[in-house]
C-alpha cells in the first residue's frame, strides 16, 4: 500500500508540537507519533511584546530535535506553522530567521483566519461526525492561548465567525497581579470577557437556536467525561459539563496538577479556559457539547493531503469562504440581485479569458468574493464607496483567507470605482508583490466591466455567453429590456490583459 509520511509542526502560545502522519487513499490520515514540548512563548509576547533570547534559544533547540525525529521517520514533506505568539512579537522576523539558520525549517506565520481554518479542517478529518453535526445550529468554540474564535454553522453552511482576543494564557497573565485579591477568580474572568460575549449574542444569535457546541482546545483531559459512553462518543450533556466545571474551579492549580497528572502550567490554564467555555455554553444554551480532542496539526495534514490529491474531503470548505463573504454582504445591506447578476457575468468573462490571464481556481474565488463585497461601502457613504468598501473588508475576518488575499479582495473592491495606481505607488502602503498586483489589476478590470453591464442595477442580462477570439472577448447577451445605457458606459472600461 502506497502512503506518504508527513510531519506537521505547530508553534503555539504555550507548547510546540510535532505530529507525524501516514497519509494514504485507502486508510486516510493516521497519526504515527506526537511530541509535545511545553514552553510559554505567548507569555513573553503578550506581556513583554517580544520573545526573550533564552526562550528563542530553547525554541531552536526543540525544533532541531524535531528535525532529527523527522529524519528518523524519513518524512516526505513537512509544514511548520506559528500563530500569534510569534506574529505579535516585535522581534518575530529575527526569531524566524534564527530558526531557519539553526534548523533549516521554514516557518509559515498564520493569520488568525488561516489558523482557525486549519482547526476546522482537523474536525473535517472526522468528517462523518462533523458533517452530520453542522446540519443543525452549531457553534464551534476554538480557544487557544491568545484568543478564542466563535463560528456559527447552520444547514451545513458557515453563518459567521468572530475572533475575540481573550485567550486562556492572555487572560491568565492579565489577571495574575490581582488573582490573590479575590476568592472568586471565575467571576473576574467572566467580567473581563462578558462585554465581548454579550455583544456577540446581540449581533449574531438573536433568535438563532444552537443545538450543538464543539469545543476545540488542549485544556480537556478524560476528567471531563462522566461515563464510558461519553468517552466513546466525545459528546457530553450540558449538565455534565457544568459538573466538570464546578470540580475545576473548586481546586487549586496544584491540586488539579496532582489529581489529573498534568504539568502545573497546564493546570493554571484550565481555570480561565473552563470559565470562558462555561460563559459561552450558558449564553448559547446548547444541550450537547462535542469535545473531539483534535489538534491543528491534523488540519495541517488534511490540507496537505488535499493539495497533493491524496485525499478528497467530504466537506466543501470553499463554500464556507463564500458563505462568510455572503453574510458580510448581508450585514452591510448589499443589493443581492445586482451581486448575483454581476457574479454571473464576471465569472463567465473570467472563464472565457483563462488562456489569456492564466489565473487558477483560487483567483476565481477571490473574484467571486470581490463581486459579493464590492458595494459594502455604500452602507457607510455613497460618496466615498471605494475607501469605505476597502476599510470594511479589511476590518472583517474572512475565514480561510490569508491576510494578503483579503487585502487583494479589498483592493479589487476599492479600485472598481477608483483609479488603480501604479505598482510603485501602491506598494508604499501595501504588501502586495508585483505578481499579486497584476492579479488585482486583471480582476479589477473584470469587475469594472461586469459592473458596467448592470449599471442600472435592473439585471437586464438574462444570460451571457463569453468567447475569446484572437485576443478579443466577444460577449453574446440575452437582455429583457433596452440596453443603451450599459452599452454606452461599458465603452469606458478597459480590460487589462497579460502579454502573450
Language model segments and positions:
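Conserved small/polar residues in nucleotide/adenosyl-binding loops
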Residues: 496-500
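Feature 926 captures the class I aminoacyl-tRNA synthetase adenylation module centered on the KMSKS loop
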Residues: 377, 489-495
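Gly/Thr-rich phosphate-binding beta-strand-loop-beta motif of the actin/hexokinase/Hsp70
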Residues: 2-29, 134-160, 218
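Conserved ATP-binding subdomain of kinase catalytic cores across diverse folds
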Residues: 33
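Helical "lid/coupling" subdomains associated with nucleotide-phosphate turnover
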Residues: 6, 44-72, 85-90, 95, ...
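A short interface-forming secondary-structure element
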Residues: 475-491
